[in-house]
Amino acid sequence: MKNLNIIFAGTPDFAAQHLQALLASNHNVIAVYTQPDKPAGRGKKLQASPVKQLAQQHNLPVYQPKSLRNEEAQSELAALNADVMVVVAYGLILPKAVLEAPRLGCLNVHGSILPRWRGAAPIQRAIWAGDKQTGVTVMQMNEGLDTGDMLHKVYCEITPQETSATLYQKLAQLAPSALIEVLDHLEDGSFQPQVQDDSQSCYADKLTKEEAKLDWTLPAAQLERNIRAFNPAPTAFLTLNLNGNEERIKIYQADVLPHQEKAAGTVLACDKKGVQIATADGVLNITRLQPSGKKPMSVQDFLNGRADWFQAGNVLS
C-alpha cells in the first residue's frame, strides 16, 4: 500500500467524518477545500463549515474558493501536486481541469447505490420511494452528475422506522471505512472500475418546502414515508385554520391505518392514539407533532389545551 497525498473537498458534518477517517489513516491530507463561511444563527455571524473547523484543529491548509471555474483557482489546486482528490458533499462543481489535476484523478463518496439516486438528495429519496436498502458508492469522478465509474459499494438496510437523520448516521458510519479501503488499494487493481448502467439510473431531486406540505390526495403509506424522509429537514407539515389564522404544524411521526370511506383530508378522530386523517388510500395516524413556537411533542401532550384543534368531520386543505 502506498501512502497517498490527498486533497480533501467537503463541507457538512457527513464530509467531516470522512476527513476524520483520512487523518487517522496512513495517507497524507495536504490541503482541504470547503465552501466559504456562511451566515448562521440569529446574529447571522459567519460560521465555518464542520470540515473547515476540523481542518483548522489539525493545522491543515484550507482553501475556500467561491468557484473552481477560474484559472487562478485551478492553478492553485494543480500546484499542490496531489496524488488524488477526495470529494464528499463539497457543493461546488468540479470542471475538467480540476478533475484531471491530481495524478489519480478525483474520487467521490455518494450516499446511494449508484446508478440509483444520482443527485442532491439520495438519502431522503431512498426513504421517500420506499426502498428497502441503500448504501454508499465510492466512484471515480467525471464531468457528469454522479455518472463516473464505480469502484466500491457498501449496502445497508432501510428499516420501516428510518428517518433521513438516522439513515444519514448509518451511512456516515459505513462510508469512511469504504473510502479508506479504496484508497489503500487504489493502485494495485483490487477495485476495478465498473461503468454505470444509465438505463437503471434515477435522480434524487432536492426536497422542496412545497413538497413538505402533506397532500391528502396521496396514499397514507406515501405520506408516512414523506414524514420520515423530510425529518429533520425541511420537515413535513400541515396547516390548520384557527379563528381565521393559519397555524402550521410540523409532523414528525405517523403510522398507517386501514381505509375508511371519507373524503381525503377529513379528520376522523383525535385521541391519545393519534390524529387520524383520511387520505386517497388509507388513514394517516399522526402521533408526534410540533405546533408553532413549541417543541416536538407526543399527541397526548398536544391534546392538553388543544383538543379542539382537530375536530372530527373537519376537512383539511
UniProtKB/Swiss-Prot annotation:
Pfam families registered for this protein in UniProt: Formyl_trans_C, Formyl_trans_N
GO cellular component entries: cytosol
Record PANTHER family: METHIONYL-TRNA FORMYLTRANSFERASE, METHIONYL-TRNA FORMYLTRANSFERASE, MITOCHONDRIAL
Any one Gene Ontology molecular-function term assigned to this protein's record: methionyl-tRNA formyltransferase activity
Residue spans crossing the bilayer: none
Protein function: Attaches a formyl group to the free amino group of methionyl-tRNA(fMet). The formyl group appears to play a dual role in the initiator identity of N-formylmethionyl-tRNA by promoting its recognition by IF2 and preventing the misappropriation of this tRNA by the elongation apparatus.
Keywords: Protein biosynthesis, Transferase
Organism phylogeny: Bacteria, Pseudomonadati, Pseudomonadota, Gammaproteobacteria, Pasteurellales
Residue numbers binding (6S)-5,6,7,8-tetrahydrofolate: 112-115
Main EC class the enzyme belongs to: transferase
This enzyme's EC code(s): 2.1.2.9
Family the UniProt entry places it in: Belongs to the Fmt family.
InterPro entries: Fmt, Formyl_trans_C, Formyl_trans_C_sf, Formyl_transf_N, Formyl_transf_N_sf, Formyl_transferase-like_C_sf, GART_AS, Met-tRNA-FMT_C
Coiled-coil residues: none
Reaction catalysis annotation: L-methionyl-tRNA(fMet) + (6R)-10-formyltetrahydrofolate = N-formyl-L-methionyl-tRNA(fMet) + (6S)-5,6,7,8-tetrahydrofolate + H(+)
Species, as recorded: Actinobacillus succinogenes (strain ATCC 55618 / DSM 22257 / CCUG 43843 / 130Z)
Name of this chain's protein: Methionyl-tRNA formyltransferase
